[in-house]
Curated annotation (Swiss-Prot):
Native source organism of the sequence: Mus musculus (Mouse)
Lineage, broadest ranks: Eukaryota, Metazoa, Chordata, Craniata, Vertebrata
Ribosomal protein keyword on record: no
Bilayer-crossing regions: none
Claim: Repeat is one of the keywords in the record: yes
Full protein name: Tetratricopeptide repeat protein 22
PANTHER family: TETRATRICOPEPTIDE REPEAT PROTEIN 22
Keywords: Repeat, TPR repeat
Domain of life: Eukaryota
Annotated signal sequence range: none
SUPFAM superfamilies in UniProt: TPR-like (SSF48452)
Length: 568
């Protein structure tokens, strides 16, 4: 064995014995695994996640800035923007020469760039900082360096890309929490405010994990220890001098107190940490009080309230922000969140009206949303804003109860204009929701062939495992419309349905696909029966079998339909 081989073997042995390994490119995250989605969709998801992370820079606490920079560099690396990735890691190294992840990540990037000298220098610096080449460098405590390295890695697990199931998302979050726990073991001497920023991120990971467990219907004994620990972590965060952490911690405590009713008995942590007589609304009020006159924090709270379905509270918070800062260029978030609340209110009331649980939705919601979004579009248009205002114009252009009936052609055309502008932006044509909305506009205008092309693209762009089956349902409806108008022959429609049904079966969960077929069946019974006869005649019975299954499930569910409608 040569000297070089012996050295390499010694290094491998040493690395195997380490309790931790710096760098982001070896972490057990979907980001680092072989992509399961096509390159275009993978790039889209990375860029969207990166854009969201950039917005975090406005609010993130100073100790967590290196963690954000490392993630930005990692996303750039996988987007093959190696120069940009290198600059992110170099920026961390310049501000903190003892940052272990910076040197590990730089060594990886330099290796990909073929810059062997820089790669060796970075690896050497890392080895020296870790004490792998004798004594560690004098500057700084090696245990503190290890703690910060692990915390930065734990932070990354909150921004993974490519998880295809709740189980995978849960595993990634659990891994991130474990890294923070290990960081705390190394970091007894970490400054208290920095440690509280770790507690804050851990709490957010725990809350997201609990949400996944709720979604999966996990037993409460599996949720209980983490629930109690999250309350303890938030109790420490409430002692922080950082008003952002204080405000959001109160908001999260309110969220947890609302979730306590999902347990058969009140979790002990509620009593142990002093929340026995505390109402969730009190917590939300304290969060707003702490954040008053601070638009970035208020905007974050408004988004959380919107996500939680507390629409009045979200609008009130947006109004508070706009009273402090009215400029839409500087405060576009408040205008956009308030518009989203209005759109959601309209759609919610519309869905209830369609199943007979309420009157027609108030179209004033659309007028208010339009006014807010137009303020933003004038000064700082974005992909999301274009999509939102297109949705508003779409609903303004169609009859509330008969969506295929146009009531305002000018509004529909304006929706298509904004969708075209969205499509001109970098990621515009990669978003399934853009293709779906464009197809719906065209379908109302009688352009069924063009609409079908949009719906096909929406299905193609959907992630595997997605529950958003509306594009597939709209595609079936467009094909049925073309067939009933003799624009497609029996053979052509049979081929199209067969191909896209198989595509949908490989992409969407079976239960969601069945629900979508039920919706199409109920709305187009005569056409579906005619199509079934045509498919049987052509020797394509797959859809026919699915339709029979749909009818069976619908019959089984009929007795409980009232209950499901109320819950919706």
């Amino acid at each position: 064995m040569t000297e070089a081989e012996v050295g390499a073997e010694d290094l491998d042995t040493l690395l195997d014995e380490l309790d931790y390994l710096p760098g982001h490119f070896h972490l057990e995250m979907q980001l680092n695994f072989e992509p399961r989605s096509p390159a275009q969709l993978r790039a889209r998801d990375l860029k969207l996640q990166r854009e969201g992370l950039r917005q975090e820079l406005e609010l993130v606490a100073t100790p967590q800035l290196p963690a954000v920079r490392h993630l930005l560099g990692t996303f750039s690396f996988y987007l093959e923007e190696l120069g940009d990735a290198r600059e992110h890691f170099l920026e961390v190294a310049r501000k903190d020469p003892g940052n272990l992840n910076a040197w590990a990540n730089l060594a990886h990037v330099y290796g990909q760039l073929g810059q062997e000298e820089e790669e060796e220098a970075s690896a050497g610096r890392l080895a020296s900082l870790m004490g792998l080449e004798g004594d560690p460098e004098d500057a700084g405590d090696p245990r503190l360096r290890a703690a910060r390295c692990l915390a930065e890695q734990g932070y990354a697990h909150g921004f993974d890309v490519g998880c295809a199931s709740p189980e995978e998302r849960a595993q990634v979050l659990e891994a991130g929490i474990a890294l923070y726990d290990k960081a705390l073991g190394y970091g007894q001497q970490i400054p208290i405010e920095e440690k509280r920023s770790w507690y804050f991120t851990m709490a957010t990971l725990f809350i997201r994990l609990d949400g996944i467990f709720l979604e999966m219907g996990s037993e409460e004994q599996k949720r209980l220890p983490a629930f109690n620990r999250t309350l303890a972590l938030l109790g420490e965060v409430l002692k922080s001098s950082d008003s952002r952490h204080q405000a959001l911690a109160w908001c999260y405590v309110g969220m947890l107190l609302e979730r306590k009713d999902t347990f058969s008995t009140t979790p002990m942590g509620v009593h142990e940490y002093g929340y026995s007589g505390t109402e969730p609304l009190d917590c939300f009020g304290k969060a707003i009080e702490i954040a008053k006159n601070q638009p970035p924090i208020l905007n974050r709270l408004a988004k959380i309230f919107h996500f939680l379905g507390k629409q009045d509270m979200a609008v009130g918070t947006c109004n508070m922000v706009l009273a402090v800062l009215t400029d839409p260029e500087l405060n576009w978030q408040a205008y956009c969140t308030r518009a989203k609340v209005r759109i959601r209110a309209y759609v919610h009331d519309l869905e209830r009206a369609k199943v007979g649980l309420g009157g027609l939705p108030d179209r004033n919601h659309l007028a208010c949303a339009k006014a807010d979004l137009e303020e933003v579009v004038k000064v700082c248009p974005s992909l999301r804003t274009y999509l939102d205002i297109s949705q508003v114009y779409y609903y303004m252009g169609v009859d509330a109860m008969r969506e295929l009936l146009a009531v305002d052609e000018a509004a529909l055309n304006q929706a298509l204009v904004f969708l075209a502008k969205a499509g001109e932006l970098e990621l515009g044509d990669t978003l399934p929701e853009l293709q779906l909305l464009r197809g719906k506009c065209l379908r109302v205008q009688g352009e069924d062939a063009n609409a079908a092309a949009c719906f096909k693209r929406a299905v193609e762009l959907d992630d595997e495992g997605s529950s958003h089956t509306e594009g597939f349902g709209c595609l079936l409806e467009a094909l049925l419309a073309q067939w009933s108008q003799a624009q497609l022959s029996d053979g052509e429609v049979g081929y199209e349905v067969d191909v896209w049904l198989r595509h949908a079966q490989g992409k969407y969960p079976a239960a969601r696909l069945r629900q979508e077929l039920q919706r199409v069946w109920r709305g187009h019974t005569e056409e579906v029966l005619g199509l079934a006869r045509a498919l049987v005649a052509q020797g394509r019975p797959a859809l026919v079998r699915l339709l029979f299954e749909t009818m069976e499930h619908e019959g089984e569910d009929a007795g409980g339909s009232g209950k499901s409608r109320v819950s919706s």
